[in-house]
């Protein structure tokens, strides 16, 4: 069985900065939801999965208990009133998709757990379920999960990324990536690394190719360097400690409900006969398909 694992939060976030984000029906903004379903159509065509799983970040993070400044650099200046209003309008669409629209259609593998991030849930899923997985995300932390049955589709480059691609690029095994990030840190999450050490330098250290006279080498083997690496390991290793074990269930997809969603939000391009028929055909090809009664979807699993 081939499962498409969506970092749904990441897909929505990318749609937030698309030219179509301002779409609306009445007073309801719909651009993020439209962008989400358009991306889903693309992914269905690319991978023809048997099953689709949606994973979401929670608002808070348990990692902050280990590292209080975790992800605190997301805003480097005070937001304007317009920017705050825009963020709030976008957040409403995230929640509507997660809690109402996706369950309404009958996708039952839809997960959010308080304190955990989408990549934690993705890691739990691939570790506790059989089959092949394609992870749709741009989160480089997920590289540590790559294997002969787990690949990625990088949303940022729109390219497939496999275990072989990773080994060719970094000259280490995917399971060593967590050690790389422990040494180098992650600037996007405000997790500082060891001074003078980036991803490539960390890879050289792990494969004994780093000059033992270099500043980076001595920084890594110093007491401070070892302390930073120990702290970072728990932050970057997936899944984070305590992440629930997730066993995937069965969907009960309703094509009629999907069509009603597209009608309700005026997603006209997705309702064109050739487009909608293709979406319907691709979804019906999955083992999750089973026509359910309207309105019987389950809410997000938390």
Q: Where do the PLM segments sit?
A:
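Conserved RecA-like ASCE P-loop NTPase motor core of nucleic-acid helicases/translocases
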Residues: 135-139
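Hydrophobic/aromatic side chains embedded in well-ordered alpha-helices
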Residues: 1, 133, 189-192
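Noncatalytic, basic helical substrate-engagement surface that gates or grips nucleic-acid strands
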Residues: 2-132, 142-160, 237-253
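Non-catalytic nucleic-acid-binding/docking modules located in mid-to-C-terminal regions
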Residues: 42, 46-56, 71-77, 82-85, ...
